[in-house]
Swiss-Prot record:
Record organism: Danio rerio (Zebrafish)
Record-linked InterPro entries: Mab-21-like_nuc_Trfase, Mab-21_HhH/H2TH-like, MAB21L/cGLR
SMART domains reported in the protein's UniProt record: Mab-21
EC number: 2.7.7.-
Record protein name field: Putative nucleotidyltransferase MAB21L1
Length: 359
């Protein structure tokens, strides 16, 4: 048994050093190329409208606010200033969303975003995004990369297509630090010893973002309340949870396997599903020794089996907001197909670790 485990870990490490590292290097190169174009567009936006200041800064070889959705798809979060005159309200009526309401006694004129406040006193995510979209469209025509970049049509999101190869979504957002949403108040679960109190304090201090992007309720149509609402995002908090042991290596393996074998019709799976399942695996295996290098095969296998279970149940709860289903809106046939593909992949890796050389 131990020999089989060691064999699997050996082949996974080989796969990591060859396939995962080359994937990372290729994506880093793409990010540099994409960020040059996005920075140029945002510079033009800032000239037209100084309230939208580019926050796409490079720190320690990574760009703040940039998320990799897939090797050809990225999201850049543009942090806005001056949320202060608004109260953050998440009453659970819109899973995964919250609203920003003008604080009592505060005048609209005190806000930097006065014309985007609704009659009821809410700061409208949709109105801000609509204005931003107009500015980006104008900036694309003026910027020095105008020959290689164009807006993606037929969406209220702000998306750029670069060199006909890459898609970048630019999402206006507010950074919320020092508060924690009520809809995530159950976390951490009291009966689970992971993460420890120090890590919990770090994660909560990291806070979350409020993104201006489309959020749909179960019927798939956006109500006016939803279009004014902001989407909760915990990217930095989630990254902090995955520090230590082989957690990040495990996620890197899953992302690479997804890119190579689970990029399927209907796009049922993305990197964020993988990240979410690694967090759940950490709860199931709370001891640091469970994440030693020699447990890499067991952890990867456990996550793939959990993924199959989620696909078969057609439900993948968000880690911090379990009422939010990350498979919502995905075609059932696409989820079934993904379950079959994941099962084939898991069986192949477990029964014949050497097959990783060809995967």
């Amino acid at each position: 048994m131990i020999a089989a485990q060691a064999k699997l870990v050996y082949h996974l490490n080989k796969y990591y050093n060859e396939k995962c590292q080359s994937r990372k290097a290729a994506i880093s190169k793409t990010i540099r190329e994409v960020c040059k174009v996005v920075s140029d567009v945002l510079k033009e936006v800032e000239v037209q409208e100084p309230r939208f200041i580019s926050s796409l800064n490079e720190m320690d070889n990574r760009f703040e606010g940039l998320e990799v959705i897939s090797p050809t798809e990225f999201e850049v979060v543009l942090y806005l200033n001056q949320m202060g005159v608004f109260n953050f309200v998440d009453d659970g009526s819109l899973p995964g969303c919250a609203v920003l309401k003008l604080s009592d006694g505060r005048k609209r004129s005190m806000s930097l975003w006065v014309e985007f406040i609704t009659a009821s006193g809410y700061l409208s995510a949709r109105k801000i995004r609509s204005r931003f979209q107009t500015l980006v469209a104008q900036a694309v025509d003026k910027c020095s990369y105008r020959d290689v970049v164009k807006m993606v049509a037929d969406t209220s999101e702000v998306k750029l297509r670069i060199r006909d190869r890459y898609v970048v979504q630019i999402t206006p957002a507010f950074k919320c630090t020092g508060i924690w949403p009520r809809s995530a108040a159950h976390w951490p679960l009291p009966h689970i010893p992971w993460p420890g109190p120090n890590r919990v304090a770090e994660v909560k201090a990291e806070g979350f973002n409020l993104l201006s992007k489309e959020c749909y309720s179960l019927n798939g149509k956006q109500s006016s309340a939803e279009s004014d609402a902001w989407v909760l995002q915990f990217a930095e908090a989630e990254n902090r949870l995955l520090l230590g042991g082989c957690r990040k290596k495990c996620l890197s393996l899953l992302k690479t396997l997804r890119d190579r074998h689970l990029e399927l019709p209907g796009q049922p799976l993305n990197n964020y599903h993988m990240k979410t399942l690694v967090s759940y695996e950490c709860e199931k295996h709370p001891r640091e020794s469970d994440w030693d290098e020699n447990c890499l095969g067991d952890r990867l296998n456990g996550i793939l089996l959990q993924l199959i279970s989620c696909l078969q149940c057609r439900r993948c709860p968000h880690y911090f907001l379990p009422n939010l289903d990350l498979f919502q809106g995905k075609p059932h046939s696409a989820l079934e197909n993904a379950a079959k593909q994941t099962w084939r992949l898991a069986r192949e890796i477990l029964t014949n670790p050497k097959s990783l050389e060809k995967l």
